């Protein structure tokens, strides 16, 4: 970057049947203040006019659409993996992830760039304000102090708040390109990216300022992870073995090998007790530590 030009942020946008919300997302993304913005979009075989809307915007604005895939990705995770692998970095200084249905406040990207520069961090995420069709709003606070191994157990917040410096993105791109097939089975791209940065010794900045309106609706793939329904979904994921499989898959992919991973791999009674005794290193909130301690007792070995 030079003093004469604004920092260039390349936004990686994943879409699937989101035409009813996409225009607001694009407007708020391209109207960011204090930065240059370009968008690379990957669509997962939409049938509702999403691609046509992207093409209309792309003909007049700073949007590139990646060629359609022969087969459906089937999840936002796989779509984002494809975006990171296939998007050309160009001359961008920073890279951000975007969903198709949110509204970004005008200084979202500038704030991320300033936080990364001031903290010398290798990754950025932030709080969001969730909103529902009935008018409800709720702050989603993820800005608790980080723990030494929290990256093994979950994401620092919604992936649509993530911003990475160019040097980190290029390393992530090489990592995903090399392990692309292996990473398909992991469910959540934001958790994987966080683990990639933190496991290699990188610093991560979680911003307490909510600079995005996080739309909630019936078609959210992830959405706000709160309430009894979310608790039931987490319980099912743990009892099915899916949560443990993701932890181990992310640890294996990022090269994390320690006593925690060994205990999770074997998970006999002594391993469970050892993990519970260290649970404060695994989650940022005390309440989440208590929940994880219970889940570690019922987590299946298979």
Predicted features along the sequence, with ranges:
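C-terminal subregions of glycosyltransferases and related glycan-biosynthesis enzymes
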Residues: 175-182, 187, 191-192, 198-199, ...
């Amino acid at each position: 970057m030079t003093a004469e030009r604004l920092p260039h942020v390349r936004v990686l946008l994943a879409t699937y049947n989101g035409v009813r919300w996409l225009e607001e997302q694009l407007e708020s993304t391209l109207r960011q203040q204090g930065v240059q913005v370009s968008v690379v979009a990957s669509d997962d075989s939409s049938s509702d006019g999403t691609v046509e809307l992207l093409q209309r915007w792309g003909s007049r604005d700073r949007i590139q659409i990646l060629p359609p895939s022969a087969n459906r990705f089937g999840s936002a995770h796989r779509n984002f993996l494809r975006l990171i692998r296939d998007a050309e970095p160009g001359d961008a200084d920073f890279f951000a992830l975007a969903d198709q249905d949110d509204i970004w406040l005008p200084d979202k990207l500038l704030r991320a760039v300033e936080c990364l520069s001031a903290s010398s961090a290798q990754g950025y995420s932030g709080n969001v304000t969730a909103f529902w069709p009935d008018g409800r709003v709720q702050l989603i606070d993820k800005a608790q102090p980080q723990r030494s191994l929290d990256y093994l157990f979950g994401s620092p917040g919604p992936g649509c708040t993530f911003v990475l410096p160019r040097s980190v993105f290029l390393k992530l791109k090489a990592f995903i390109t090399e392990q692309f097939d292996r990473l398909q089975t992991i469910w959540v791209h934001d958790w994987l990216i966080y683990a990639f940065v933190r496991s290699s010794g990188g610093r991560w900045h979680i911003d307490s300022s909510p600079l995005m309106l996080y739309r909630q609706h019936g078609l959210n793939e992830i959405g706000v992870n709160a309430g009894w329904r979310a608790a039931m979904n987490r319980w099912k994921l743990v009892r099915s073995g899916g949560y443990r499989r993701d932890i181990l898959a992310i640890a294996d992919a990022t090269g994390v090998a320690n006593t925690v991973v060994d205990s999770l791999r074997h998970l006999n009674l002594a391993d469970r007790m050892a993990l519970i005794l260290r649970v404060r290193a695994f989650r940022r909130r005390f309440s989440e530590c208590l929940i994880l301690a219970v889940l570690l007792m019922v987590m299946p070995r298979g």
